[in-house]
C-alpha cells in the first residue's frame, strides 16, 4: 500500500521509498534542488537540471550519485514505477508519481507553481489515487496580483530608484526566484549586477535551454547605475558605506501586512514560485 508518512521528508513505509528526505538515505527521490529538499544521499533520482544544481551546491561527489530521469519517463525501483512531471516551481523541479504493480498510484507534489513562469517548465498535473501536496500559501487571503502587475512593480521600483540616484537592491532566493527576476529586468533593458551564487546557477539554466541575461559580478565598490540582485541570506555582507540604496524583498510573503517590517526593507514585492490559495484549489 502507498501510505505516506512525514519523517523529515515523505516516506512510504510499505515500500521503503523516501522523497525529499532532509537527511542522507541509501536512496531517495529529490523533487528539486532547494536545500530543504536535498541531502547527501548515497543514491538519488532526479531530473538532469536538478542533478546539475546539486553539483554546484553540494559538489561533484554527491552529484555523481544522481540517477537522471527525464520528465514522463519511467524508473523501476523494486516493484514500483516512478515518473517525474514538471512542477513549475524552478527549473528541473518535479512532482513524483509512484505506481504499484496492482495499479495503485500516489502523486507527491512538493513545491509547485501553477502560473506560467519565465524560468521554469510549465506544470503538468497527472492523475493519481492519492495526492500529497504542499500548502505554503494555503489560506484564502493569499491571492497574488496578476503576474504582469508584479513584474511592472519590480521594474518601476528599479527605475524610480535609479532616477533618484540610488541603487536598487533586490533580495531574491538564488535558485529560481533570482532567475525569474533577471528575465524581468532583461525585458526592461535594465543593467544588472548579480551575486556569484546566482551567476553560477545561471549557467545551468543556459545549458538546459533557458538563456539568462548577461550580468556583471556583484562589486559593492562599483555600483554605478546598476540593479543589484542578491540572495537575502547574504544581506549582512552589504557594506555600511555603499552609495544610497533601497532594498526590496521579492517574496510571496509580501502579501502579509507585516512583511516590510519583518524583512526590514523599503518595499516588498509578491513574486512567488509557489502556488497561491486559488492555485492550490485548481491543482486539486
Regions found by a protein language model. Name each.
Residues 95-284:
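Metal-dependent phosphodiesterase/nuclease catalytic metal-binding core
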Residues 2-12, 16-23, 27, 33-171, ...:
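His/Asp/Glu-rich metal-coordinating catalytic cores
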Amino acid at each position: 500500500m502507498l501510505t505516506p508518512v512525514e519523517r523529515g521528508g515523505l516516506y512510504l513505509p510499505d515500500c521503503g521509498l523516501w522523497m525529499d528526505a532532509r537527511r542522507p538515505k541509501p536512496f531517495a527521490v529529490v523533487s528539486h534542488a532547494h536545500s530543504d529538499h536535498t541531502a547527501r544521499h548515497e543514491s538519488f533520482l532526479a531530473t538532469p537540471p536538478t542533478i546539475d544544481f546539486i553539483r554546484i551546491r553540494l559538489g561533484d561527489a554527491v552529484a555523481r550519485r544522481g540517477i537522471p530521469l527525464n520528465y514522463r519517463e519511467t524508473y523501476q525501483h523494486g516493484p514500483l514505477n516512478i515518473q517525474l512531471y514538471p512542477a513549475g516551481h524552478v527549473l528541473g523541479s518535479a512532482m513524483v508519481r509512484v505506481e504499484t504493480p496492482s495499479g495503485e498510484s500516489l502523486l507527491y507534489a512538493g513545491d509547485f507553481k501553477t502560473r506560467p513562469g519565465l524560468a521554469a517548465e510549465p506544470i503538468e498535473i497527472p492523475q493519481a489515487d492519492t495526492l500529497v501536496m504542499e500548502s505554503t500559501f494555503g489560506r484564502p487571503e493569499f491571492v497574488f496580483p496578476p503576474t504582469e502587475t508584479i513584474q511592472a512593480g519590480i521594474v518601476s521600483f528599479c527605475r524610480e530608484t535609479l532616477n533618484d540616484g540610488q541603487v536598487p537592491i533586490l533580495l531574491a532566493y538564488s535558485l529560481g526566484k533570482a532567475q525569474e527576476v533577471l528575465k524581468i529586468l532583461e525585458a526592461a533593458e535594465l543593467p544588472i549586477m548579480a551575486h556569484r551564487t546566482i551567476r553560477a546557477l545561471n549557467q545551468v539554466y543556459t545549458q538546459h535551454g533557458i538563456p539568462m541575461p548577461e550580468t556583471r559580478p556583484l562589486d559593492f565598490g562599483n555600483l554605478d547605475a546598476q540593479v543589484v540582485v542578491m540572495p537575502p541570506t547574504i544581506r549582512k555582507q552589504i557594506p555600511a558605506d555603499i552609495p544610497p540604496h533601497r532594498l526590496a524583498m521579492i517574496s510571496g510573503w509580501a502579501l502579509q501586512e507585516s512583511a516590510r517590517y519583518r524583512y526590514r526593507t523599503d518595499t516588498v514585492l509578491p513574486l512567488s514560485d509557489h502556488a497561491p490559495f486559488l492555485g492550490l484549489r485548481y491543482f486539486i
